[in-house]
Design a protein with these regions (language model features):
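Hydrophobic, small-residue-rich alpha-helical packing segments that form membrane-like cores
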Residues: 131-134, 149
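A structural signal for short hydrophobic beta-strand segments in well-ordered beta-sheet cores
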Residues: 140-143
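Amphipathic, small/basic residue-rich leader segments at the start of a protein or domain
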Residues: 1-89, 106, 110-117
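A short, Trp-centered hydrophobic/proline-enriched beta-strand micro-motif
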Residues: 118-126, 170
Length: 193
């Protein structure tokens, strides 16, 4: 691991971008301009091309197939070198792991590599106008019609929603449950139709 840490540190010293001449966000919640988005997308893509994203994700989907300790080293070096943020957080931390664990082969092949490379941006659709962040009170409904679900409802606070290609959406698929958190399902929804 020490040799890898040295490799990452050397790469960061050479490749972490200098001041771009405009304000960079400190978290993905603060991305507010196309200029910031383009800069951060290019940075994430560069990290992925260098082999420093998805360290423990399978190689067949664009990951590195290594132990998660390697990603920890990369993350520490990113902080130590004051690198720009990795902004596709919803894709990297929620959608990707969920798909790797529960997704179909088709979904993994379609989405995982594009999450890592920042080719596609993800947002989340959990909170709703009348219930805020109380996920147990979700009113958005998903009703199965044939082979598909029809989703009806409203979402708010969809961080990165104005830039996203896809949304991970929480909807109620069963209204006849005893507990308010039962009957909820995740859906992958396109943002650009």
């Amino acid at each position: 691991l020490q040799a890898f840490k040295s490799e990452v540190a050397a790469w960061m010293a050479e490749n972490v971008p200098s001041d771009p001449g405009f304000l960079l966000p400190l978290t993905f919640l603060e991305v507010g301009t196309e200029q910031q988005l383009d800069f951060l997308r290019e940075w994430q893509h560069k990290l992925w091309q260098a082999g420093f994203l998805g360290m423990h994700w399978p190689t067949e989907y664009g990951g590195q197939g290594a132990d998660s300790a390697y990603q920890f080293i990369v993350d520490k070096e990113l902080g130590r070198h004051r690198a720009p943020i990795i902004f596709n957080t919803i894709g990297l931390n929620w959608v990707g792991p969920l798909l790797l664990d529960m997704g179909t082969e088709e979904e993994k092949s379609k989405y995982i590599k594009n999450i890592l490379s920042a080719e596609e941006i993800w947002c989340q659709g959990f909170s709703e106008p009348d219930h805020g962040s109380d996920l147990g009170a979700v009113q958005t409904r998903a009703v199965k019609e044939g082979d598909e679900y029809v989703v009806n409802g409203s979402k708010i606070w969809t961080t990165l929603g104005n830039y996203a290609d896809h949304m991970i959406l929480l909807a109620r698929t069963n209204t006849k449950t005893e507990r308010k958190y039962d009957g909820l399902s995740f859906f992958l929804s396109p943002m650009k139709v």
